[in-house]
């Protein structure tokens, strides 16, 4: 199998796994049969294959931190990063040189259709796992709901997306607050197609992220759905959004962050239905659809793999090189 599964990914329906499986469906089986494409977690190396290491995690992750070592990097013919911010961070943390071994290929989506939205009720949505900022969103929304009876928050959030149902237990009190609030609905885990269908009727993607991430497929899909995306300028979100979303300066202090987010979300609720904002969101959608479309990204992968196959057509040229002796004074 060109696209590897491991003990963690096999039960997951997360972004990494969805993209990996989607790419496998779109590429010519004849092209990829000579490849070993590893997503983040290295388990074994196939020396007769052309090896591509596709990174979706941070360089601080123990599963990828081995890239600090030149010998580890030399095992791969190409290292693919899922975003520019992530690539820069690997250079900074792991000392990876800026050279032709690396390449950035964005995380793809299927662009969502353009729809006409109604604004009799302002619908907010959260579509990521709970540890990324749901603990800020819920109390902030509770306060805003006192001010705006016409707002509603839908929460699609659960570790079940990764096959980790037990991890939800610590967030159960938070989920219960959502279930018990008349202006909030907790959906738990839902298939991606169901989430995307809901995005088409929503107006604001409320995402007070406190979790460093390389990029955010949930944000990309919300941009494509024409939502006003409200999130901090944190981690890879600036790169993901192209600086086009309604970003704010967050704070590592949760209480300060919550107060800042309250102001940002309040502003979004007041303005999301205006003609000026709606016209601007059309531009944001064009950007997201152009940059992240599957047709573009799959073509980039096809070009990359075709070039590597030409370069390493001889199986004898694919072996892992012997470790080099480095004299340290």
Task: State each model region's role.
Residues 1-45:
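N-terminal pre-catalytic "stem/leader" segment of glycosyltransferase-like enzymes
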